[in-house]
Amino acid sequence: LEILEIPETQAERWLEAQFPGTDPKELHRAALYGGGNLGRSRSFLEEEAVRRRYGQALSLLSALANGKEFDVVSALAPFEGDKAGFLQLLQDFDGLLGRLAALPYGGTADPELAPIASKISPLRAAAMHDRIDGIRQRLFYNAGCPLTVALFGAQLKEI
């Protein structure tokens, strides 16, 4: 499931067959989250921790879109001592940035990103994406997770 990627519409149909009775909006969210990767989409539906982390990434993006510094700090605070969780947040946040940047160019409509899309341009989303790789490298080579989380928040506010 993790290797095969398919169009999101096909992913939704596959998820509907695997999870009968699931709300179609949740199936759509899972397909968008997975980006055509069935394993990621399935984990979104099966694991509360995955949905919670995705919600935290969405909260971070919303806080940045609205220019609320306290909300940015609040969204990052749970990860100050959680290196693995922060790396997962970065992955989800990066996925949101990619979808956000693609929206004006024919990306899949996403009701959760629609209000944010008018506030964060594709260039700004790309600039945020560029910061993520550097933060991942810092986490890999340095153990200072709280300082790295703070640095990431500061860098995002400058963009």
Annotate each PLM feature.
Residues L1-D92, R99, L103-I159:
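Charged, glycine-rich active-site and insertion segments that engage polyanionic ligands
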